[in-house]
From Swiss-Prot:
Region described as Catalytic: spans on this chain: 27-461
PROSITE patterns noted in UniProt: CBM1_1, CBM1_2
Residues annotated as domain CBM1: 503-539
GO MF entries: cellulose 1,4-beta-cellobiosidase activity; cellulose binding
Record's subcellular location: Secreted
Sorted UniProt keywords: Carbohydrate metabolism, Cellulose degradation, Disulfide bond, Glycoprotein, Glycosidase, Hydrolase, Polysaccharide degradation, Secreted, Signal
Record-linked InterPro entries: CBD_sf, Cellulose-bd_dom_fun, ConA-like_dom_sf, Glyco_hydro_7, Glyco_hydro_7_sf
GO terms for biological process, alphabetical: cellulose catabolic process
UniProt KW Glycoprotein keyword: yes
Protein name: Probable 1,4-beta-D-glucan cellobiohydrolase B
Signal peptide start and end residues: 1-26
Keyword Transmembrane helix annotated: no
Similarity-based family: Belongs to the glycosyl hydrolase 7 (cellulase C) family.
Length: 539
């Protein structure tokens, strides 16, 4: 997610054939262009490392689409202003406006190939498009929902072409699987057209929420000619797996008092879009792990331990207190695989703030050491985030720039008035003058990010199960019989049969616990470490 004003925009005119008009979230469906979802394969893995391909699809958020009069082709929204005749109020606007299909490659710079999705920053066709936000689909009318408790989520990413100020974000939100189609009678478009977005910032820049327009109370943005804030926002829990460019990265859980999507009113929404940031029902800050912010300035970046000049595999594990999918979320772990080596997440170097994973204790200590308000605990902490993961969340893949704070919260000093030696201020090596969207759009229009090779499965099942890019048919891949692993600066080559075989347990795989029947010996130099009675892991 996106902790600042989302800057996905389309520059529009009034010509029908351009098919690139105001970026809005419509609820009715037009007939000018058929909606065809690009295919994107992903995999589910079993405990033995065998993975099965799912034939998924992606859909672009409705906020990017052309929306026009249902009886013609007049824009409902142009620049950052509503058409007063078509949209005098929320209900009339929803009734009068229709949403069209998308030309993914030519208009939005979004292309797929096998299991890969490539997003381009600036796409110039008849008009100019900035960034994009897409969702994984189960079928043409339904978002895929992922339940990640006691699971790990793995994907490959190439951020080599993302400079300071850009954010290639892959994350989960508690959207309705049908995009709100069944809950809200005013919504006739649904997930097929990318409706129903929500996140922990309770965004108010959405043009339609819960089947109604957001025109009442709409204030055009003073910095973004194509955006504004309405009287309502759309709230839900958010799990940021990956927010990154080539300089910095962070992963961040954001719980809400109630995980699912709900509409909020005005400044009581809280978050980036409201005057009272902490006045809502969600945690806008979250509890983040950014290696640079935690004190290790040589871990992630060009030529560093995790080398952003190369594609990498990112593994995120969601551990529970009892080692089951019905347990309580207790820890979120991160590690990387690059050049055949497993790389442990960096350790925090600040006094009284040790560790390399997220737990309730770590998050409380971080808020104290960094002097931040502990809204993470206020809104449920790990337990609150776990409630959302248990219900199932929708996968979001995006690329954006930041009109609110130039992405300095990710890759530079924030606040800019702070001293870089003060704990928590420095988040990356980018200059505080970097990240201006106008500069990025002018000087880095060809910036891009590629997400690929998505896998989900039991702990230890996904990161050593091959890196194929399958086509449309269902296939399976088995883990390699050998792997080169790295823990800190030590490298070892070991043979393994996978976590439930009779040989040696893989690095970071399960190696013990109640009900576990796999190998209990870890590959050197790893040690089987008890996490709880139900789960031990090779660390």
């Amino acid at each position: 997610m996106l902790p600042s004003t989302i800057s996905y925009r389309i520059y529009k005119n009034a010509l029908f054939f351009a098919a690139l008009f105001g970026a809005v979230q419509a609820q009715k469906v037009g007939t000018s262009k058929a909606e065809v979802h690009p295919s994107m394969a992903w995999q589910t893995c079993a405990a033995d490392g065998t993975c099965t391909t799912k034939n998924g699809k992606v859909v672009i958020d409705a906020n990017w689409r052309w929306v026009h009069d249902v009886k013609g082709y007049t824009n409902c929204y142009t620049g950052n202003t509503w058409n007063a005749e078509l949209c005098p109020d929320n209900e009339s606007c929803a009734e009068n406006c229709a949403l069209e299909g998308a030309d993914y490659a030519a208009t939005y710079g979004a292309t797929t190939s096998g299991n890969a999705l490539s997003l381009k920053f600036v796409t110039q066709s008849q008009q100019k498009n900035i960034g994009s936000r897409l969702y994984m689909m189960k079928d043409d009318n339904t978002y895929e929902t992922f339940k990640l408790l006691n699971q790990e989520f793995t994907f490959d990413v190439d951020v080599s072409n993302l400079p300071c100020g850009l954010n290639g974000a892959l994350y989960f939100v508690s959207m309705d699987a049908d995009g709100g189609l069944s809950r809200y009678t005013g919504n006739e478009a649904g997930a097929k057209y990318g409706t129903g977005y929500c996140d922990s910032q309770c965004p108010r820049d959405l043009k339609f929420i819960n089947g109604l327009a957001n025109v009442e109370g709409w204030t055009p943005s003073s910095s973004d000619a194509n955006a504004g804030n309405g009287g309502h926002g759309s709230c839900c829990a958010e799990m940021d797996i990956w927010e990154a460019n080539s300089i910095s990265t962070a992963y961040t859980p954001h719980p809400c008092d109630t995980p699912g999507q709900a509409m909020c009113n005005g400044d009581s929404c809280g978050g980036t879009y409201s005057s009272d940031r902490y006045g809502g029902t969600c945690d806008p800050d979250g509890c983040d792990f950014n290696s640079y912010r935690q004190g290790n300035k040589s871990f992630y970046g060009p030529g560093m331990t995790v080398d952003t000049k190369k594609k990498m595999t990112v593994v995120t594990q969601f551990l529970t207190n009892d080692g089951t999918a019905t347990g309580t979320l207790s820890e979120i772990k991160r590690f990387y695989v690059q050049d055949g080596k497993v790389i442990a997440n960096s350790e925090s170097t600040w006094p009284n703030l040790g560790g390399n994973s997220l737990t309730n204790d770590f998050c409380k200590a971080q808020k104290t050491v960094f002097g931040d308000m502990d809204t993470f605990s206020k809104h449920g902490g790990m337990e609150g985030m776990g409630a959302a993961l248990a219900e199932g969340m929708v996968l979001v893949m995006s690329l954006w720039d930041d009109h609110n704070s130039n992405m300095l919260w990710l890759d530079s000093n924030s606040p800019t008035t702070g001293t870089s030696t003060t704990p928590g201020v420095a988040r990356g090596s980018c200059d505080i003058s970097s990240g201006d969207p106008k500069d990025l759009e002018a000087n880095h229009p060809d910036a891009s990010v590629v997400y690929s090779n998505i896998k989900v499965g039991p702990i230890g099942s996904t990161f050593n199960s091959g890196g194929s890019n399958p086509g449309g048919s269902t296939t399976t891949t088995k883990p390699a019989t050998s792997t080169t692993t790295t823990k800190a600066t030590t490298t070892a080559t070991t043979n393994t049969t996978g976590p439930t075989g009779t040989g040696v347990a893989q690095p970071w795989a399960q190696c013990g616990g109640i009900g576990y029947s796999g190998p209990t010996q870890c590959a050197a130099p790893y040690t089987c470490t008890k996490q709880n009675d139900y789960y031990s892991q090779c660390l």
